[in-house]
Amino acid sequence: MRYYNLKDHEEIVDFKTAAIQGQGKDKGLFFPERLLLFDKEFIQNLHQYSDVEIAYQCMKDFVSDKIPSETLRKIVSETINFAIPLRKINDDISVLELFHGPTLAFKDIGAGFMSRCLSYFLQDQQKKVTVLVATSGDTGGAVAHGFYDLPGIDVVILYPKNRVSPVQEKQLTALGKNIYALEVNGSFDDCQSLVKQAFSDEETNEQLFLTSANSINVARWLPQQIYYLLALKQWQQTESKAPVICVPSGNFGNICAGILAHLRGLPAEHFIAACNANNVIPEYLKTKNFSPKKAMATLSNAMDVGDPSNFVRIMELFNNEFDLLKNKISGYSIDDEKTMQTISEIITNTIIFSIRIVL
């Protein structure tokens, strides 16, 4: 599989280059040249496959010959070595629990896969790589854990002051060794802007050999497809119809991976982009006017993004045709008051719920 730069289609690279380089010229994101479909029999009979085999089948065409098959199987096995259960809330709603990983964030999967790929690619390289990443909360901890103490790799994490939770800040700042956390007096969008600025500086790139661990990196973005397949495997045990998939959305890498999996053959009736008060995409879907804004601080801080980087990939998946996009995706914006009200209602009205206490 080769990847082209969405801002310069003549820039074409392989998976290894895309993973190490992070993004292309002029801050362009890389995108796969082809969308290889899942075998129908595979999708219809996921229960016959182990989770590791499902993950391997999901990723093998994107990695191609850059990682040997057995090494890739080992990478995906280590990446998904924790429970990813689909819990039934009521007759109409099930929720995929993605908080059982080492940093309690759904990004443990993407960050875990990427860190292992980079470790493999860089094992014989003399020059140290610097992973530069902006975080709104979850990404930083997952990346820090995934890359912690890996030889030949330094990690620099930019996070917005007073906009991550105390637990998230400890995950960023407490590890030490090759993990460096920098507090930025601004929003996540400011952090992301600094990262993009660094990547566009040729001298900085050459000196530090920069790569990114945000979902702009294909090695972080693409493996998120895996848990959509694992959710479908469990869904098929009790349901015959295709699900409507609702995804909490900030930088839009997660839902973009789900849509990619769908276009490859994963059944989905519709997608819902669930946003907090940062409503750029819901407004776009209503008005056809894409107008990035300065991110607003909310209780769901990991979703505080006013200019979602991955939306350009979603548009590419739909050939930049608004009507095709709107037919498959709806967007909703929920404020803090409604967020708290819904949490309270779920706890009060749902029999099956759990409180996880981390000592």
How should each PLM-predicted stretch be described?
Residues 1-359:
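PLP-dependent amino-acid enzyme catalytic core
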